Amino acid sequence: MKIYYEKDADISLIQKLKVAVVGYGSQGHAHALNLKDSGVKQIKVALQEGSASRKKAEAAGLEVVSVADAAKWADVLMILVPDEKQAVLYANEIEPHLRAGQHLMFGHGFNIHYNLIRPRADVDVSLSAPKGPGHTLRNQYQMGFGLPGLIAIHQDATGSAQAVALSYSKAIGNTRAGVIETSFREETETDLFGEQAVLCGGIVELIKAGYETLVEAGYAPEMAYFECLHETKLIVDLIYEGGIANMNYSISNTAEYGEYVTGPRLVNAETKKEMKKVLEDIQNGTFARNWVLENQAGAPGFHAMRQRMSSHPIEEVGEKLRGMMHWAQNDRLVDKSRN
């Protein structure tokens, strides 16, 4: 596995080019601001008409243009609008204005891997994917650090696709931590699996089930919140810092023993069998097709599930308890008024 660091990338390449960041959400705001702070002078944010993000981007000192105008102007287009919106936006606002030698970049391989976007052969197509949310990418950059990232080349029409992609990755801070060379397929499938089975789907359902079990047994919701949600960060921080063994070194023997005897009762062979089915749905395109169809119908199921989750009792309890933790409100990663 090839890993690139600061010395492997020439930041002057991206500094000489005209760069448009399409979208200004979690990833878009971090990419645009990190590029700007890294000396990329010719940078614009491309947004659709009426976008609520326009004021945020302009307040940050960034020039905002239409997506079509960005496609005509830029040498490098980083497409960071939500996955479900990219294909239509590309077909209507980007593809008609492309010229030979331009460089299309993506922060996630979803649309390329599942052939929802099929770029013409005379443009470069690459991936520069930070391994973390945009708010964390920006925070780490400002602290002088960086997030690990991934790089992949789908098309190299000019012969310089990799050099430019590495230069871009350096400008957003990824080479400070290391950039791993991969493929669009590998990035897409592992990313989706990690999100669904572990990081978002798995953890959230485990937290909810634990909380509900304690509350239904008569324990105070506040105690259930602390034990099943709040302390998750404390444990994950230890794992993040030095692995599972590092976490086990820090916790009590009682907690460690409980990990060994109880963990396998909850996550067992049946769980792993279901995980393999989840991976198969990702690999064969079932998940992608379902997500595309959901959005073509206006995403009614998605919005209903989002509403149910935001209305879960753990959210109300958490909001009340977090209001008591003033120290936890300092240096917030997410400030919805700015990013």
Swiss-Prot record:
Mg(2+) 1 binds at residues 191, 195. InterPro entries: 6-PGluconate_DH-like_C_sf, KARI, KARI_C, KARI_N, KARI_prok, NAD(P)-bd_dom_sf. Pfam families: KARI_C (PF01450), KARI_N (PF07991). GO terms for cellular component: cytosol. It catalyses: (2R)-2,3-dihydroxy-3-methylbutanoate + NADP(+) = (2S)-2-acetolactate + NADPH + H(+); (2R,3R)-2,3-dihydroxy-3-methylpentanoate + NADP(+) = (S)-2-ethyl-2-hydroxy-3-oxobutanoate + NADPH + H(+). Pathway: Amino-acid biosynthesis; L-isoleucine biosynthesis; L-isoleucine from 2-oxobutanoate: step 2/4; Amino-acid biosynthesis; L-valine biosynthesis; L-valine from pyruvate: step 2/4. Binds 2 magnesium ions per subunit. Residues 1-182 form the KARI N-terminal Rossmann domain. Keywords: Amino-acid biosynthesis, Branched-chain amino acid biosynthesis, Magnesium, Metal-binding, NADP, Oxidoreductase. One of its GO terms (molecular function) is magnesium ion binding. Substrate binds at residue 252. The keyword NADP applies. Its cofactor is Mg(2+). It is an enzyme of class 1 (oxidoreductase). NADP(+) binds at residues 24-27, 51, 53, 83-86, 134. The active site is at residue 108. Belongs to the ketol-acid reductoisomerase family. Involved in the biosynthesis of branched-chain amino acids (BCAA). Catalyzes an alkyl-migration followed by a ketol-acid reduction of (S)-2-acetolactate (S2AL) to yield (R)-2,3-dihydroxy-isovalerate. In the isomerase reaction, S2AL is rearranged via a Mg-dependent methyl migration to produce 3-hydroxy-3-methyl-2-ketobutyrate (HMKB). In the reductase reaction, this 2-ketoacid undergoes a metal-dependent reduction by NADPH to yield (R)-2,3-dihydroxy-isovalerate. NCBIfam families: ilvC, PRK05479.1, PRK13403.1. This is Ketol-acid reductoisomerase (NADP(+)).
